[in-house]
Amino acid sequence: MNQTNPFREDKIVKSKGMHQRTVSGILIPEKWDDKNNVIGVSIQAFDENEYIVKSCLDDKDLFDFIKKKVKVAGKVFERSDGKFNIEVNHFDVMDN
């Protein structure tokens, strides 16, 4: 059985401003509601970029892993402010 590794470091595909890539970093709160509950997260990546998570297709809940090191695979879209949006297809929590 040949499985595709979603974390292949060399997997970067350009298509209409979108890149399929792997990102590693610390998952941090990015957005809060009026009751101070976290409603959005981003990844402060080891490449010194910030990736704002727009969606997560993985069954696991990213919010359970805030302040943890994560490795995510997904579609990255560059924003006009220099940050990036990411649609996460798969993620794993890394050992500290």
Protein language model regions, located:
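OB-fold and OB-like single-stranded nucleic-acid-recognition modules
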Residues: 1-96
